[in-house]
A protein has these predicted regions:
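Bacterial N-terminal signal peptides
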Residues: 7-17
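Conserved functional micro-motifs across diverse proteins
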Residues: 22-217
Length: 217
């Protein structure tokens, strides 16, 4: 009987796609990624979402800002200190320097910026090259239901705090307009310059995360 079961099961396993048996494997622990910087009791890890299949509608909503040329980076902050740390998200930049191109410093986009750049150009050809970095939209048309829904969804996953509690890990997404040049992420550094211990107001040294070794996912 056991031999008969093995005779049936073994050919099925051999015929299965190589990746099928690992589809239910747990994703890697983000804190083990090599795209990190750590000092003064703070570890920061960056996980850029480089593939379209990572942009789940359940997480990011039905309107794909990735298809509009933007990328999300999931950033983890592990504060091992006894003191909380204040972060200024508005000073975070993605510094890109692909071969043969000038260095660019891209600011972190708000959910409103992402929605503007995704939805207000929805009827145009999003593949058309535009100024890089793309300028902030000015007085555009009124915001509709889709825009409100998208901004609410992105606010739910974006890095939404400027306080890193002691002995805790905080994470959230940052958004950057790559103008569809997603390969440039591998020639980029995530620059986080403005962090301060809240108890004694002492500034931390800046953090700079090389994204060259980001997983291809």
């Amino acid at each position: 009987m056991h031999r008969a079961i093995l005779t049936i099961v073994l050919p099925v396993l051999l015929l299965a796609p190589l990746g099928a048996l690992g589809q239910n494997a747990a994703p890697p622990d983000p804190m083990t990624l090599r795209t990190r910087d750590a000092h003064q009791g703070l570890t920061i890890v960056a996980d850029p979402f480089l593939k379209a299949d990572r942009y789940s509608k359940d997480v990011f909503g039905k309107n794909s800002f990735y298809n509009a040329g933007m990328v999300a980076i999931d950033v983890y902050f592990r504060n091992d200190n006894d003191s909380p740390i204040r972060l200024n998200p508005e000073t975070i930049e993605l510094v890109t320097s692909p071969p043969g191109q000038d260095r660019q410093r891209l600011g972190n986009l708000s959910p409103e910026d992402v929605a503007d750049r995704t939805l207000l150009t929805a009827n145009s050809n999003v593949r058309v090259r535009r100024p890089f970095p793309f300028p902030n939209p000015t007085n555009g048309p009124g915001h509709n239901k889709d825009w409100v829904e998208m901004t609410n969804t992105l606010h739910g996953v974006a890095l939404g705090t400027d306080i890193l509690p002691p002995h805790a890990t905080t994470h959230g997404f940052l958004f950057f307009d790559m103008n569809h040049d997603f390969g440039a992420v591998r020639y980029s550094h995530l620059f986080i310059p403005d962090l301060t211990f809240m108890t004694d107001k002492k500034a931390l040294f800046f953090f700079e995360i090389d994204l060259a070794d980001a997983p291809s996912r």
